[in-house]
Amino acid sequence: MKNQICTILGGGGFIGRYLVRNLTKKNYRCIISTRKAFQKGYLKTQATPGAIELVDWNPNNFSELKEAIKNSDVVINLIGILYETRKQKFYNIHTNIPEAVAKICADSDVKKFIHVSAIGANENSKSLYQKSKYQGEVKVLNNFKNTVILRPSVVCGTEDNFTNLFSKLSILPVIPVVGINYKFQPILVDDVADAIVKAIEQKGNDCLLYTSPSPRDNRVS
């Protein structure tokens, strides 16, 4: 399974940086899509020369996407947003783009598609975020057979936005409480990266879905 080519969409983000380290240590070649120039210098230091190829990709330019994917054995989609902006909407990022990626994988020689969704993805959710994640899963499964979907919980680590927000709040004289007895189960980014590598190396051609919370509950009270 080694020396395969993995195209990582959104590979310059938080999870992507850890995943690239894991993959290159196992001698995978990584094609990383990123639009942010400041990330590129950092990514090039993650492996020996030739192990990483950086490509510019506008998520709405599917011709560029085809070019990035055409020689890949595995495609990993890490693209996602936590909130909408004027230019970035949940439905486009979480539903339309995964569907387009799955279709391109089906038309290429891609052997496996790893789609990272989110815990709580649900068709009937009142959250547009969770609903768009679920719809993206359906589109992916309808268009590419050999798909693994991962639903990680809140991903935490030394560079994440979630736990660092609590760290910043701790210096305030009063800390806002987001919900009494609200439970959450964050998962370490290292564990998410490990799970993706295992999904790549797992044999089989069936569509699989994994929900990945931490084994320990945490409570906001």
Map each language-model feature to its residues:
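Substrate-positioning beta->alpha
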Residues: 161-162, 179-200, 208, 212
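Conserved beta-loop-beta element that borders a ligand/cofactor-binding pocket
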Residues: 117, 138-164, 168
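SDR active-site strand-loop-helix element
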Residues: 9, 33, 78, 113-118, ...
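N-terminal Rossmann-fold cofactor-binding loop
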Residues: 33-37, 58-59
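NAD(P)H-binding glycine-rich loop region in Rossmannoid oxidoreductase-like domains
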Residues: 48-99, 104-107, 119-123
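N-terminal Rossmann NAD(P)H-binding glycine-rich loop of SDR-like oxidoreductase domains
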Residues: 6-26
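Short alpha-helix in the Rossmann-fold core of NAD(P)-dependent oxidoreductases
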Residues: 91-95, 114, 133, 185
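Single conserved hydrophobic/aromatic residue that forms the stacking wall/gate
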Residues: 210-221
